[in-house]
């Protein structure tokens, strides 16, 4: 149809679907979630941005939860006490808050949107205020600059609401409504961000009006952008929070949402957010830490300050398998609350108990962290990483090894990275490794060893077969991995073990090699690795083809050689 001279296209789905603002009758349960319109949260390419994005999501969820509680609604999930909303927001309360909220009763989508926008406004205005105070001479109050920030303040998020007389129906209603998105993406003139390429580069004159008298001058724009980011980098580094790696490299050119993700982790900006959020509340703060504050990342540089020696680090990204499906299977509110509490308790315990590095965020079913030696001059060994991965699975399963403590299985990507691998590449490798672990059947770990030249070797295995690396024994009864690594290379060179592109595939030699080195103290034939692998090949390798079985064995040896070798 045509309205006011403009064509309006309406799909069949939109005709049949109730608008987001229209509430469902006889609603006993409400489910709320939200998403950024441009995906700027999940497209983080720096560790600091990833942390900032995680905290933004958690903080906005907390605002919605508190809004529901303030109106007398019972929040079923996430599990949160009344005091957690009465008290000031802090890292301990907010971190790991999921952005899917289940509420008992008919909670308005408009109220959820208002609560989210209140929290987002606090974040945006804190960033604007800091820029205005620290870059006064750059005229950051330019009308175009203000216009751009206002657009992102209004159009950054979309809220989805589902309702039903049962929890399962409310969840289904939410998924249906998510199919129809009604967001508006802010438009812009000029060049796009150097990180994502999706949005305009943020700088004071980014949205100046182009007229006949005020023609666009690309050379002048570039000079203004360079000047802005040089000044911004200097202001961030000169604010009594010395940090490595630096908050901002002057060569980076960020969009407004990318800049917000970076700024919220700065101690001055996080304090401003805290102040704006609580300026009208009489609260005893105590010793709680502001929501977005984080210590510096200097220990993640992978280089010893004194000796200049470099070292490898482990990066892990884990996620519970089919959590949404598990939630739908829980029909009683108390079961959902119990599951939510278990996830949050696990994430809190995991974060506080991790001694081999730092957990950047832990939301219960999803977490991300970095493994490194906390003692100067002592390098973290790859074998230590394997031991930790084995123990992680045990911790996730809980005391009863025959069932999952949390009701869901775990998929994880682990990256062992050389010191010269750029941080953005490491994060991408983590995402790919986790995705691969899920795609091959879930309940798996993918270990990827990334070298400084960008090449890598990897191995994906169900968790319980990770311990096979510990069963290695060389021809002399030791643990020298060069024996099996050398034999593998020799057999491949002679085509005794075919390449993955060979027409004829026979796994017999590869299985014999597995038995030769990984059957220490095994007497029963049924317990031989070759027989276990052959009998359970589809489950273990994700395929019944010989070439995939050969590749699985080869990958295990390559990864074991890199992480467990004593030479």
Label the model's feature ranges.
Residues 1-567:
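Regulatory and interdomain segments flanking nucleotide-handling catalytic cores
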């Amino acid at each position: 149809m045509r309205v006011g001279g403009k064509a309006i296209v309406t799909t069949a789905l939109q005709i049949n679907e109730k608008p987001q603002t229209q509430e469902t009758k006889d609603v006993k349960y409400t489910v709320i979630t939200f998403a950024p319109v441009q995906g700027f949260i999940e497209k983080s390419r720096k560790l600091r941005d990833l942390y900032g994005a995680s905290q933004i999501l958690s903080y906005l969820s907390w605002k919605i939860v508190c809004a529901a509680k303030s109106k007398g609604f019972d929040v079923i999930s996430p599990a949160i006490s009344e005091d957690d909303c009465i008290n000031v927001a802090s890292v301990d309360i907010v971190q790991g808050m999921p952005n899917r909220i289940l509420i008992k009763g008919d909670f308005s989508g408009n109220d959820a949107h208002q609560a989210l926008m209140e929290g987002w406004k606090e974040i945006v205005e804190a960033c604007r205020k800091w820029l205005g105070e620290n870059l006064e001479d750059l005229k950051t109050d330019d009308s175009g600059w203000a216009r751009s920030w206002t657009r992102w303040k209004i159009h950054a998020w979309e809220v989805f609401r589902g309702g039903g007389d049962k929890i399962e129906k409310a969840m289904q209603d939410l998924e249906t409504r998510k199919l129809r998105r009604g967001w508006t993406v802010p438009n812009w003139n000029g060049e796009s961000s150097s990180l994502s390429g999706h949005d305009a580069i943020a700088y004071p004159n980014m949205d100046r009006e182009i007229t006949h008298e005020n023609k666009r001058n690309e050379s002048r724009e570039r000079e203004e952008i360079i000047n802005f980011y040089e000044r911004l980098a200097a202001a961030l580094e000169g604010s009594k929070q010395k940090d490595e790696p630096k908050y901002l490299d002057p060569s980076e050119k960020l969009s407004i949402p990318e800049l917000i993700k970076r700024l919220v982790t700065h101690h001055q900006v996080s304090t401003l957010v805290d102040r704006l959020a609580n300026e009208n509340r009489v609260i005893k703060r105590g010793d709680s830490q502001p929501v977005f504050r984080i210590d510096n990342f200097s220990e993640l540089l992978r280089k010893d300050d004194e000796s200049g020696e470099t070292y490898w680090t482990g990066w892990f990204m884990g996620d519970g398998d089919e959590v949404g499906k598990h939630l739908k299977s829980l029909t009683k509110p108390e079961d959902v609350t119990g599951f939510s509490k278990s996830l949050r308790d696990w994430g809190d315990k995991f974060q506080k108990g991790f001694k081999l590095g730092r957990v950047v965020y832990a939301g219960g079913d999803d977490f991300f962290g970095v493994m490194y030696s906390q003692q100067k001059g002592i390098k973290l060994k790859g074998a230590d990483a394997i031991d930790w991965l084995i123990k992680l699975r045990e911790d996730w399963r809980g005391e009863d090894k025959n069932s999952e403590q949390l009701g869901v299985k775990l998929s994880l990507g682990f990256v062992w990275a050389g010191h010269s691998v750029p941080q953005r590449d490491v994060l991408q490798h983590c995402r790919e490794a986790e995705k691969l672990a899920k795609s091959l059947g879930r309940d798996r770990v993918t270990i990827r060893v990334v070298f400084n030249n960008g090449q890598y070797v990897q191995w994906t295995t169900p968790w319980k077969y990770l311990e096979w690396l510990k069963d290695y024994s060389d021809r002399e009864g030791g643990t020298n991995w060069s024996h099996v690594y050398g034999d593998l290379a020799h057999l491949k060179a002679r085509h005794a073990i075919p390449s993955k592109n060979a027409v004829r595939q026979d796994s017999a030699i590869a299985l014999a090699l597995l038995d030769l080195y990984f059957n220490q103290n095994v007497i029963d034939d049924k317990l031989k690795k070759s027989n276990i692998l052959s009998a359970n090949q589809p489950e273990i390798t994700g395929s019944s083809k010989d070439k995939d079985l050969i590749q699985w064995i080869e990958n295990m040896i390559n990864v074991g050689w890199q992480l467990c070798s004593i030479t």
